[in-house]
């Protein structure tokens, strides 16, 4: 299943990794472009999950259209106070 995970915080990153290990094609969306680039470069969410590798098969992007286009499921893992910005 093609899944978009909106929100690259602790919960969003954890869900993306678990969904990937359960055989799904996952795209992880991060609001801040600079942090998305850091996640791509390091493949570790140093702010929320230091030491936990993000598998290279998980696509990381800050482009919400790229993240949600042609997906079977969209997971919303954004804190409620930031929902308006999504």
What are these regions (language model features)?
Residues 1-52, 59-62:
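NAD(P)+-binding Rossmann beta1-loop-alpha1 motif at the extreme N-terminus of oxidoreductases
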Residues 52-86:
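Rossmann-like NAD(P)-binding element
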């Amino acid at each position: 299943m093609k899944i978009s995970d909106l929100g690259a915080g602790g919960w969003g990153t954890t869900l993306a990794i678990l969904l990937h290990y359960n055989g799904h094609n996952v795209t992880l969306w991060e609001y801040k472009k600079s942090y998305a680039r850091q996640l791509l470069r390091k493949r570790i969410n140093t702010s929320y999950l230091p030491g936990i590798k993000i598998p290279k098969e998980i696509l990381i992007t800050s482009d919400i259209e790229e993240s949600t286009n042609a997906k079977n499921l969209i997971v919303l893992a954004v804190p409620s106070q930031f929902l308006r910005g999504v």
